[in-house]
């Protein structure tokens, strides 16, 4: 299973900001590291997020909720989640509107990890 590096996510954030507008910069590098590492957390030697879909949901939720960046947390959260799924050869059948709604719902506190996982499974091909 792949693991996106902090450096890769920082580059993606910069590219997204250049393409769509907004500020570039990390507000708290520890929150970014926490969001990226959470998907691979273990307890008693057991992975907390065992499947690729669970890891993707954790990445999306943590990146959006942690607000590690000054701007673009929703965009980077959904982009990293979808990039992870694509890298793991999990195809999604969702529209841009579906993705925007997901990001906004998570940021507003209306979707948590479990709902994101359901969303992934709903739109998975």
Please give the residue ranges for each predicted region.
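FIC/Doc superfamily catalytic core
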Residues: 1-125
């Amino acid at each position: 299973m792949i693991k996106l590096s902090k450096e890769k996510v920082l580059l993606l954030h910069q590219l997204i900001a250049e393409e769509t507008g907004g500020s570039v910069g990390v507000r708290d590098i520890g929150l970014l590291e926490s969001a990226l590492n959470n998907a691979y957390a273990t307890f008693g030697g057991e992975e907390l997020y065992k499947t690729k879909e669970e890891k993707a949901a954790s990445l999306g939720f943590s990146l959006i909720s942690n607000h590690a960046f000054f701007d673009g947390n929703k965009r980077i959260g959904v982009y990293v989640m979808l990039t992870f799924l694509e890298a793991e050869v999990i195809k999604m059948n969702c529209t841009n509107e579906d993705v925007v709604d997901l990001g906004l719902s998570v940021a507003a506190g209306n979707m948590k990890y479990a709902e994101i996982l359901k969303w992934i499974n709903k739109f998975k091909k």
